Every structure is written in C-alpha cells, then in structure tokens.
Amino acid sequence: MTDTVSSSPLSGSFDFDLDADDITSVLRKHLEGYAPSLDRQQVGHIIEVGDGIARISGLPNTSVNELLEFEGGTLGLALNLDEESIGAVVLGEMGHIEEGQAVTATGRILSVPVGDGLLGRVVNPLGQALDGKGDVTSSETRRLEVQAPGVVDRQPVKEPLQTGIKSIDAMTPVGRGQRELVIGDRKTGKTAVCVDAIINQKGQGVKCIYVAIGQKGSTVAEVVATLEEAGAMEYTVVVTSPASDPAPFKYLAPYSGAAMGQHWMDNGEHALIVYDDLSKQAEAYRQLSLLLRRPPGREAYPGDVFYLHSRLLERSAKLGDHLGGGSLTALPVIETKEGDVSAYIPTNVISITDGQIYLQTDLFRSGVRPAVDVGISVSRVGGSAQTKAMKAVAGTLKLDLAQFRELEAFASFGSELDAVSKAQLDRGYKLTELLKQGLHSPMPMEEQVVSLYAGTKGFLDDLEVSDVRRFEQELLEEFRSRYSDLLGEIKSSGKLPDKDKLEEAIKAFTKRFQDSTKAKAASDGKPAAKDDKAAAKDEKPAAEKSAG
C-alpha cells in the first residue's frame, strides 16, 4: 500500500511517497540485534557520616569486607552488619561524602595484586604504587582475608631460615614457616633485626615483604634506602601505611602483606614477612571498633582483638609436600612500654607465636647489640630449625649466658667470688663480646659456626675482652683466605668438618694472634696480657701484703 502526498511548487509544498513495507523492514533490521538488558544495582543511602565511618541503610545483601562505592568514586569497606544498617569505613577522602547520598554495593570482596610484579616496589595496603615508578604490573589478585592452612595441609618446621645474626641463629633459631615475635621497648633495635634478616635472604631463594604500620614516613624511607643499598629490594616488596594514614589503612596493611606472601607460599616458593609493628595495628583496630560502637573490653580493645592477630599469624606455615612445600615465615614486631611483656597485646601475640626474641633496653644502652636477652628469649621450634653444625657449637651457649647474667647481677653487689665463678664471669664477658654484631652486617652460617666454635671451646679464655672483636675479624679473614675448603664443607653439608682440622686451624691462628698482641704491647711499652693462672698467682702475695 502506497500513500501519495502532492502539493503545488508555488506554495512551497512537495511530493513524496510513504512505503509502509520499507519502513517496517528497516525497523525490523535495526531491532534484530537488540537484546534488552537491565542494569541492576543495590543502592543504599548514608544516614550518618563522620570520623572515617559511614552508617548506611538499604543494602541488606552486603557481605563482610565487601567494597562499597560512594558518590564520586570513593570506596568503603563494610565491617559492621547490623539489622537495620551497615557500618562501613571510608577508604579515601571524606570531604565530599554527606548524609543522604547514594551508596552502591559493588559485590567485590577487597583484594590486592600479587605476584613477582610487586618485587622492588613500595605500595599502600590496597596495592597501589607509592614509589613514583608507575602502576604495579600484576596479572593476579588475591583476597586480603582468606582461611589459614589447616592442620592436614601443614608439616612441622624443620628447615632453618638464617637471619645472619649470631645471637638469634645460635640461641633462638628461626625456621621456614615459623612465627617468631620480636619484642622490646622503642629504640632497642627491633626494626634493625628484621631488616638484617631480610638482607641475609639474598641468594637464598626467599622473597620478602616488609609491612610498615603507623611508622614515620622518614623511617620507612630509611628502611627502603637500606634495602636498596644492600641489593635486597630485588626480592622485597614494601607495604606501608604511615602514621599520617587513616586507621582503616593501618588495620588492613598486615592482611595485604600476608596475601602477597601466601601467593608465593601456595606456589611452592618461600617467603618472609615482617609486620612492623602489630601494636599500632591493634590501636588502629581499637579506634575503628569504638567508632563502630562495638563493646569495649580490657584497655578499651574490642573482644575480638586476639582473633585480629591470630587469624593473621596463622596464615604463616610450612605447607605439606603434596601442596608444593612452600613456606611463609613471619617476624611480627610488638613494642612494649617500660619492658612490660605482661601487658594485654604482648601476651596475646606471645601466646600465638612460636617463640619470641626479647630486646632489652639496658643491654642496648650498655653497647650489647643486638640486645637479645637470652633469659626470656625462646624459640619453640628449637634445634629443629638449626643445622647440625650450629647445633653442635651452640649447644650450651644459651644456658652459659643465662647463668652468666645471673652471676653478673650477683657479683655487682661486691660479693667475694671463688675462682670457678670468676672464670665463668670472664668467659661470659668474652662470649657477650663475641655475639655483638654491627648494624646491617649479617654473617653467613658457616662463619658463625667457626666464630662460635672458637668461643665455646675456650680459645678466647687467654684473650683480653677488648681483643675479642679483632680476634674474630682476623680469624674469619684467615679462614676465608686459607681454609675456604672448611667453610665450604660447613655450608654445603650443614655439619661440622673434621674436628681435628678445625681445631688445629683455630689453635694455630690463636697462637699467632697472641704472639702478635704481645709483640705489639711490648713495642707500645705496655705489659703483656697475663693468663688467669698467672694473674691469680700475682694476686695472692699482694693480698697477703695488704693484710700484713
């Protein structure tokens, strides 16, 4: 059917034909590929906002840790799921968020990028780059919070993770998959111990994560510079939430680092994670919980603050061989006040971990660094995480030093001591000097074994305390140049070499060292150092003379 419309040109009108069939076919053609779709969204509204917290109504199907989107694109994290509303923390700028605004449920659980693309980078708890080197390149993401490996999925900790610190590797050894707490007052060297442990993993096939929680920005920059200088950033990722960050970021930072570490563990690799420090995470969680109006408990912490740390630290494990045999080792840090390890958060974390390294303020101030207090420090894994060589030389070292500390405290009262006690004190001072170590200078396991063998077998007994560090330095130089085969044997086998060879080498060096020390003293016009027996003989007539 065709309709024709006509008009005169003079009147400005025109003729055209309308073909209904053509119009229908064109419309059909355009509608053929059309599929109706509905964009369905869950939308709620803000009923209260302030202090980084938003209370939202109208999102009944929201999950815990689900991401919410505010107007303007700012993200929030659902933490409280109440009957009538949701308590969410705002992950970003709050200036434009107001009551009455719409909030959209994204359906996504908070995740972070993982994988080797993170190595050498400094990121925030959401995995966003902070180092100005462009976006993080990662093809995989992982949820911040996942279930820790079960009992069947684990195997006992039996493989050593060398920290490079003599006093730790000898007396409180750390194994792959272990959780070893580093605890002490502020300014006692906790961060230095952990950074040294990271530096010592170079060439060991261990990837590292350093999580800085509530630290000063300058402190984090210093740690990153130290790691770069030592070439450790090649296998390390730094996750930082500085003191200037809002509380939600400090709360999330450790879980973000754990997710990155678990990725490597699940792929059969080995990882080491440092949480520096969990005291500040607990304080941030307390702040969030009080703002979310959760009931406060002891010291105003919420009732689940133990679970806050236990679910984090339980994610560190040594997986069974059927799952690839990967491991995630944790070094959590806790700051104490006035040395009080019996406070709430310290006792919580001590009960969760597999031992603790306690750094004492008095030792630190007296020049014993690292300031490890052997009396209270312990590794619940113990000798299982040591090589046979280290176990052989460090067998009684911890007991000897603990007894020395007690005897030293007793001697400070000015009591008369017998010859055995004096000898024990003298050896204790020399062993303490031997265990001192410079900042950021971790020592290979084979060199530690040689050094400790010399100390525990009495080779230091005839030296002055002031000569011990020089003796150790020159002894190790001698072994590197003349006895590298012995060092290589210790490194490859993990066992002590032929004791006669080792003892003969140390004995020969000790004699040369004593001769050179005496010659130097004679040339300087000083009396040569006497051994203990000669000194005791000289003391006796002097005492008789003074009595007369």
Q: Where do the protein language model's features map onto the residues?
A:
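Acidic-enriched and Gly/Ser
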Residues: 3-30, 36-39, 45-161, 497
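Conserved catalytic/coupling modules of large nucleotide/cofactor-utilizing molecular machines
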Residues: 4-9, 13, 96, 263, ...
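P-loop NTPase nucleotide-binding/switch module
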Residues: 101-103, 110, 114-117, 130-179, ...
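Phosphate-binding/switch loop-helix module in NTP-utilizing enzymes
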Residues: 171, 248-285
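Walker A/P-loop NTP-binding active-site region of P-loop NTPases
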Residues: 176-226, 277
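Nucleotide-state-sensitive switch-loop elements of NTP-binding domains
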Residues: 203-206, 217-263, 290-302, 322
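Loop/turn-to-beta-strand initiation segments
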Residues: 205-208, 234-237, 268-272, 325-330
